Amino acid sequence: MLAIIIELGWPIWPLIVASVLALALIIERSIALRREKILPATLLAEVIASWRKRQMAPGAIAELEQNSPLGRVLASALRNDHATREGAMQQVEAAGAVVANRLSKNLTLLGSIGSVAPLLGLLGTVVGMIAIFASQQAGSNPQELARGISVALYSTAFGIIVAVPAVLTYRHFRRLVDDYLVEMEDQAERLLEQVYDVPGGS
């Protein structure tokens, strides 16, 4: 394999860099988007219980905001700078937009690698084919020509190998983020029902 990489020359190096970067992004997002870090299972119940006990002082709300992405959204529903449920929902939507942006970190880059990798592989193959035919003289060995073409095609194959997991994981993470955001909105609405529909609510 090392010999093939050396034969492919400079066009293969962008693909190698892309593959390493894609792997790093996949690992980073897999860790960052773990459900327990985004949507702590008992957080909503704890917040509702604290609200009913009148324990959600500004300091507690600030601490909730730092708890997790869900905590940030729930905290926005408890801010005292809005007087109506509609105003609270606007705060929730604004917090949700910030959270969505943070959860989507690096996903665009991962998707771009998945899109560009096959093109880089094709570029390597084209460059290799040009070099092969330019070096051929009359009476050249057909076996050497066939081997040169075979080696050049490795570049396209490598590009596809890099692209497939990048595209699949990009789509998986995008779906995961979308699902998280829907669930955050649902939990925020359930909290607002408690805040605005019970005695003592705003």
Placement of each model-derived feature along the sequence:
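Mid-bilayer segments of alpha-helical transmembrane spans in multi-pass integral membrane proteins
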Residues: P118-V127, A152-I160
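Predominantly long cytosolic amphipathic alpha-helical stalk/bundle segments
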Residues: K37-L120, V127-G139, L168, H172-S202
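Membrane-interfacial hairpin junctions
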Residues: A3, A134-R147
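Pore-lining and gate-forming transmembrane alpha-helices of multi-pass membrane transport proteins
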Residues: Q143, R147-Y170, R174
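Residue-level signature of catalytic and energy-coupling elements of molecular machines
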Residues: G9, L23, G59, L74, ...
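Hydrophobic membrane-targeting segments
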Residues: M1-L43
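Alpha-helical transmembrane segments of integral membrane proteins
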Residues: I12-L25, G111-P118, G124, V162-A166
